[in-house]
């Protein structure tokens, strides 16, 4: 009987090897330090106009999201200073780009600012908080005094952080592109590289998208920085112009990059591609 009961008893489970303790999650890698230019003469803020004129046909499309500090009432009345159709087109075409954003624009459109800042296709750079001129006589813009210039730039960065832009770049575009020695000296402590351009898109207040596209296509050379705008009310033709420009430049063998990559090339070092950004071939 004892033998029969032993035969009917369920087999003992085999001893299990001890499970390894779960590994701690790896710490996120620190963001790479964006390339900048060395200070200019007398330690002034350096100014970048274009990348190397080499056989590597690269071009950077840049877009100014330039709502001015005193335009809040116009936005409240329905004027649109954003351009979601343009951003959607850049995403659909897989075009990396640099957006020079004012702090006031980011305040008005925080969700869009955050979306741009978190999309690896784009990089967000500084276009001041107020979009007031840093010199006199600059396209009729109000002016910011020399003793407030640095604060205006730093206020924009503070807004970017507040709305959730994780990694705004240390690049600054002067409102209207207007600057002088006083402005360069005032911004030296901010540690930014001023970014100008060598190709004017001419989209501000333009009504002919084909004319804007022709102006860009006629001006682009290897290493070019193209200035356009990300504002529906002031630049309504930009999206259509971009849809014309992008395939044509690719047909000519150009590769679209962000400004950081051109600055890295100017410094003689390659900027590694960021995760999630497709390699774009012409």
Regions found by a protein language model. Give the residues of each.
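Structural recognition of the beta-strand scaffold that forms the well-ordered cores
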Residues: 59-62, 97-101, 123-126, 170-174, ...
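Accessory recognition modules or surfaces
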Residues: 117-123, 151, 207-209, 213-229, ...
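Extracytoplasmic/secreted proteins, especially bacterial periplasmic and envelope-associated proteins
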Residues: 58, 81-85, 108-111, 148-151, ...
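N-terminal pre-catalytic segment of deacetylase/amide-hydrolase enzymes
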Residues: 1-84, 113, 244-245, 252-282
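Acidic-and-aromatic substrate-binding clefts and catalytic sites of carbohydrate-active enzymes
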Residues: 69, 77-78, 101-110, 173-180, ...
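Sec-exported extracytoplasmic/periplasmic mature domains
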Residues: 91-95, 117-118, 154, 158-165, ...
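His/Asp/Glu-enriched short active-site or ligand-binding loop at hydrolase and phosphoryl-transfer sites
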Residues: 179, 183-220, 254-265
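Active-site beta->alpha N-cap acidic-glycine motif
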Residues: 33-126, 130-142, 155-168
